[in-house]
């Protein structure tokens, strides 16, 4: 039997914990690396810390089948690139965190 490996919205119990006690699963780390320039001079932790929560996180949803995030944290690296950290409540007591970064989405610039 073969197993298809995917990181799509996987919330495993192997979380890094950000300074504000938000869990960061491997999926979100992978998406940050995938969706930001490879030669970026700002890493994930710095982008998260320098980012700002938006007042109405419900505007940052992915599609109709996924619920809106409880929090959305935006980091813009000038006009070059930017990301949105989509943060949801984590109801799993074994993780030890109240919130988790569900995924990281690139900001498209037009």
Language model: regions and residue ranges:
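Ribonuclease/tRNase effector modules and their secretory precursors
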Residues: 1-110
């Amino acid at each position: 039997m073969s197993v298809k490996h995917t990181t799509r919205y996987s919330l495993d119990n192997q979380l890094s914990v950000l300074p504000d006690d938000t869990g960061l699963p491997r999926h979100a780390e992978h998406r940050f690396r995938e969706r930001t320039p490879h030669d970026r001079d700002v890493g994930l932790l710095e982008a998260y810390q320098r980012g700002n929560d938006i007042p109405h996180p419900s505007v940052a949803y992915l599609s109709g089948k996924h619920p809106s995030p409880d929090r959305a944290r935006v980091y813009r690296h000038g006009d070059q690139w930017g990301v949105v950290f989509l943060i949801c409540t984590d109801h799993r007591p074994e993780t030890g965190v109240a919130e988790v970064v569900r995924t990281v989405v690139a900001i498209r610039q037009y």
